[in-house]
């Protein structure tokens, strides 16, 4: 495990190409379990989480080839009903193979998930939904076992909260429940869910409504092989846009779907940044101190929780006081203490952070606590005076492809240093 050494004071200029969406690729890879024929996925980012999912697919009987950004998946052996704990503990999204394995083989046993430490993200919504679809659920010794027990004709599942993971898990599983009609109410509406619907439908599934709060799945008997391209990563795009603005630079962010970031764009413009949308590219310029703004995270189409830490780093040097309210992951403020070590003036009360803008941050040793928090500290290091050393930095490689090269090409001075034994 190494650290990132960031020399502050760089002004980011130039172009950056956005990779495929990790949060779309992972559930689509899990959905490939539904199909015996070869699935070819394009625009797949080369990230640690993707490699973990590849290992999971291989462990349960699939052949997986990954060259550049193209992934080929095909069932090679009988599907194993159990996923090793050492794989599932590495990544929360790996839990979403439980339903697809169970619907294919009648039974699945998967360890309770791991992943980023940003508060409780219970799997109860997943399990209650699977029960309604005819699966028995047993939780013991850190594992969840799902067994298919009864066929259903029709069921409505109302999620207590529009959970992205639960929505993806349940719609994927329901897609292969032949003859069943499953309705998910209060479904998450993220673009990644629309991408998953489009992928499953290309394989022969019958799903409607993704992108709205009501998704209807008509289960089919069999899926077919398909070639499919993953959507661009809206969170990666937002991270580079806010980094360029924070450095008071100018840049062009390419391979973006602007419709996926409308709320975020509005907030950037409120701070004084100038944005110009050019098809699937976004130009941003910011030459002055940002104005303070209030930010409230909400499920899509609200302001993305995955961009809240980066926005906080940006607003830490704004003129005035910003109020950031976190409504998705209530404890997603682990980065606050690290930003304060760099001179930020931030106070937290419950799920609200009060950010009083300071003139400058100063470089300091800090620690990455999760994926997006580490991205926020990288942005803070770029705009700070002096040198910032970010330890526990491996988080960032879970969500940003070629992150050091991309930031360096924009003019950031970043070096990855291996930790000495």
Swiss-Prot record:
Transmembrane segments: none
Regions annotated as coiled coil: none
NCBIfam families: murA (TIGR01072), PRK09369.1 (NF006873)
Residue sites binding UDP-N-acetyl-alpha-D-glucosamine per the record: 92, 306, 328
Positions annotated as active site in the UniProt record: 116 (proton donor)
Family as reported in the entry's similarity comment: Belongs to the EPSP synthase family. MurA subfamily.
Post-translational modification 2-(S-cysteinyl)pyruvic acid O-phosphothioketal, affected residues: 116
Keyword Cell division in record: yes
Catalytic reactions on record: phosphoenolpyruvate + UDP-N-acetyl-alpha-D-glucosamine = UDP-N-acetyl-3-O-(1-carboxyvinyl)-alpha-D-glucosamine + phosphate
Signal peptide positions (record): none
GO molecular function ontology, one term from the record: UDP-N-acetylglucosamine 1-carboxyvinyltransferase activity
This protein's UniProt keywords: Cell cycle, Cell division, Cell shape, Cell wall biogenesis/degradation, Cytoplasm, Peptidoglycan synthesis, Pyruvate, Transferase
Known pathway: Cell wall biogenesis; peptidoglycan biosynthesis
GO BP terms in the entry: cell division; cell wall organization; peptidoglycan biosynthetic process; regulation of cell shape; UDP-N-acetylgalactosamine biosynthetic process
Enzyme Commission number, as recorded: 2.5.1.7
Residues where phosphoenolpyruvate binds: 22-23
Enzyme class name: transferase
UniProt-annotated location(s): Cytoplasm
Keyword set includes rRNA-binding: no
Taxonomic superkingdom: Bacteria
Matching Pfam families: EPSP_synthase
Organism of derivation: Thermotoga maritima (strain ATCC 43589 / DSM 3109 / JCM 10099 / NBRC 100826 / MSB8)
Protein name: UDP-N-acetylglucosamine 1-carboxyvinyltransferase
